[in-house]
Amino acid sequence: MAVNLTEKTAEQLPDIDGIALYTAQAGVKKPGHTDLTLIAVAAGSTVGAVFTTNRFCAAPVHIAKSHLFDEDGVRALVINTGNANAGTGAQGRIDALAVCAAAARQIGCKPNQVLPFSTGVILEPLPADKIIAALPKMQPAFWNEAARAIMTTDTVPKAASREGKVGDKHTVRATGIAKGSGMIHPNMATMLGFIATDAKVSQPVLQLMTQEIADETFNTITVDGDTSTNDSFVIIATGKNSQSEIDNIADPRYAQLKELLCSLALELAQAIVRDGEGATKFITVRVENAKTRDEARQAAYAVARSPLVKTAFFASDPNLGRLLAAIGYAGVADLDTDLVEMYLDDILVAEHGGRAASYTEAQGQAVMSKAEITVRIKLHRGQAAATVYTCDLSHGYVSINADYRS
């Protein structure tokens, strides 16, 4: 049950010049499901990417990392669902390379110009033969179809677009898709995200921008505290809008383009939380007046990933001592609890180390019954702030994950 999230139509997701999309049914996920996607990238495009921090990262992550900075440039991304190709050892890498070679033959490039991505069950061999057999059968697709093809336990395809001025003369377009519903936690999580723009950006600058955007968007979400083996976020810049290249972060267009792409990426990241496994509520946790952003994030994550907090939200139960407890164990050094203020939406709940005199249980109940809730925490020890996004923890989460392989 997604929280205020609906599927985008093809008309809402404009094509990006220099990008071609293809999908097919490879039979990796389940019979009758479209589970293979190819994103063909025009020659001369640049690509930035960031990947999971999980030490058991999947075979395609290893291969994509090694191909990303190849001097020949990236010409294609190939994505399968239904199998993560993680925990598959040397054979997993052989299989990922075989898929790259087959995709390269299909579009006429070198295997090292293909980035592979997989998502699905871990510790199962990749049926590379099925993927290779399906590649010649791929059909042209729209962005909304590609968004559906990369889903696993998602209930709604996730896609978004932006258009805006970058520089004085040029309008930039960007469209992106993402997947993810469970095993979601900062530092990328099983989440895949792909954004394409017609802006022209040098590879080193695009790589830095990709890292910054990931940190400000996908690394601010948590569903269940688990970090996947396959997380990947990619930005493709085709350079087809005739603007001159952005090759320096001091270029004013860098900040303009980053703001546009950050807005798109944040919509995709929030969509993952809204479609969190079993989610019935979307929760924003904002910590203000911290000494540093890291400290603010530390406190926000403690609240956002607490099972006790998340189940209280599911039950619409204003058992708000759970939130105070999470702030207390967040590890904020020398925290003066007498200075902390906590709000549910605009309702002051706690101050001076205890319950606010003005707060009533009825007020808390009214807020906790909403589908979207904001928790605001003021530490009163500095000027830094951070926001993270999470969802509640329901019976549905347990059922989805208990039945995942059945």
From Swiss-Prot:
> What InterPro entries is this protein classified in?
Arg_biosynth_ArgJ, ArgJ-like_dom_sf, ArgJ_beta_C
**List of residues binding substrate:** T152, K179, T190, E277, N401, S406
In this chain, the site described as Cleavage is at A189, T190
Where found in the cell?
Answer: Cytoplasm
Task: Provide the catalytic activity annotation.
Answer: N(2)-acetyl-L-ornithine + L-glutamate = N-acetyl-L-glutamate + L-ornithine; L-glutamate + acetyl-CoA = N-acetyl-L-glutamate + CoA + H(+)
Q: Say where the protein is mainly found.
A: cytoplasm
Q: Which pathway, metabolic or otherwise, does it act in?
A: Amino-acid biosynthesis; L-arginine biosynthesis; L-ornithine and N-acetyl-L-glutamate from L-glutamate and N(2)-acetyl-L-ornithine (cyclic): step 1/1; Amino-acid biosynthesis; L-arginine biosynthesis; N(2)-acetyl-L-ornithine from L-glutamate: step 1/4
One annotated GO biological process: ornithine biosynthetic process
Lineage, top-rank taxon, reads Bacteria
Similarity section: Belongs to the ArgJ family.
Q: What is this protein called?
A: Arginine biosynthesis bifunctional protein ArgJ
Q: Which gene encodes it?
A: argJ
